[in-house]
From Swiss-Prot:
Annotated protein name in UniProt: DNA-directed RNA polymerase subunit Rpo12
GO molecular function, one term: zinc ion binding
GO CC terms: cytoplasm; DNA-directed RNA polymerase complex
Keyword Zinc belongs to the record: yes
EC number(s) reported in the record: 2.7.7.6
Lineage: Archaea, Thermoproteota, Thermoprotei, Sulfolobales, Sulfolobaceae
Organism field: Sulfurisphaera tokodaii (strain DSM 16993 / JCM 10545 / NBRC 100140 / 7)
SMART domains reported for this sequence: RPOLCX
Binding residue positions for Zn(2+): 9, 26, 29
Recorded catalytic activity of this chain's protein: RNA(n) + a ribonucleoside 5'-triphosphate = RNA(n+1) + diphosphate
Biological role: DNA-dependent RNA polymerase (RNAP) catalyzes the transcription of DNA into RNA using the four ribonucleoside triphosphates as substrates.
Cofactor or coenzyme needed: Zn(2+)
Length: 48
C-alpha cells in the first residue's frame, strides 16, 4: 500500500482512500496536489 500526503492540509492517507473519490484529490480537503510519501531508508556508505 502506498502512502500519500496532501499538499494543502498535509494529512497522510493510503491509496484505498484515494480511490474513493473520482479523480486524484485529497479525501479530506479536496486539494488536487498530492505527494507520494517515501519510506524512510538509511543509505550505508563505506568510509574511505
Amino acid at each position: 500500500m502506498a502512502k500519500y500526503r496532501c499538499g494543502n492540509c498535509w494529512r497522510e492517507f493510503d491509496d484505498e482512500q484515494l480511490r474513493a473519490l473520482p479523480g486524484v484529490r485529497c479525501p479530506y480537503c479536496g486539494y488536487k496536489i498530492i505527494y507520494m510519501v517515501r519510506k524512510p531508508t538509511v543509505k550505508v556508505v563505506k568510509a574511505i
